[in-house]
């Protein structure tokens, strides 16, 4: 939910900035988003990590007990990748099985990791240049990860 909240905030801020820059007097209505905008933000903010569904499964691993020196089984999560596909691409593929995504939504979900996932800096940059929503979704994901959910 943090990514959705961050994405909505970023989108409203960017929309406000664009209105202010254009010099039109729409400031009062700028924070009102259309139903289509609200749906797009929900789709991207909530479904960008659909690829993680059933990806992590409960398991155990052995850890040496510091006090006794004995090995003990402790619960953990392991990876069970039933669909070895890229992170962003896999989410687009999964979501597309249930609903039609606009090109902008597909690009935002695909590139929400930026070029971190597979090192495709050139393609990520091209997508960010063409689809503002892709940039905002990536930023929202980073904010949620490092500002809202950081446990360190």
What are these regions (language model features)?
Residues 2-7, 11:
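Glycine-rich active-site/cofactor-binding loop and its immediate structural neighborhood
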Residues 12-150:
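Divalent metal-dependent catalytic cores for phosphoryl transfer on phosphate-bearing substrates
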């Amino acid at each position: 939910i943090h990514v959705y909240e961050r994405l909505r905030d970023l989108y409203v801020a960017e929309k406000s900035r664009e209105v202010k820059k254009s010099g039109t007097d729409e400031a009062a209505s700028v924070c009102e988003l259309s139903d289509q905008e609200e749906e797009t933000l929900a789709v991207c903010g909530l479904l960008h990590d659909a690829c993680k569904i059933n990806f992590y499964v409960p398991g155990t691993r052995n850890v040496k007990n510091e006090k006794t020196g004995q090995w003990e089984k402790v619960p953990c999560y392991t990876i069970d990748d039933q669909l070895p596909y890229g992170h962003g691409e896999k989410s687009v593929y999964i979501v597309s099985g249930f609903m039609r995504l606009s090109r902008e939504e597909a690009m935002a979900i695909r590139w929400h990791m930026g070029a971190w996932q597979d090192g495709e800096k050139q393609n990520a940059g091209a997508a960010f240049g063409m689809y503002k929503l892709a940039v905002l979704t990536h930023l929202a994901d980073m904010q949620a990860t490092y500002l809202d959910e950081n446990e360190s």
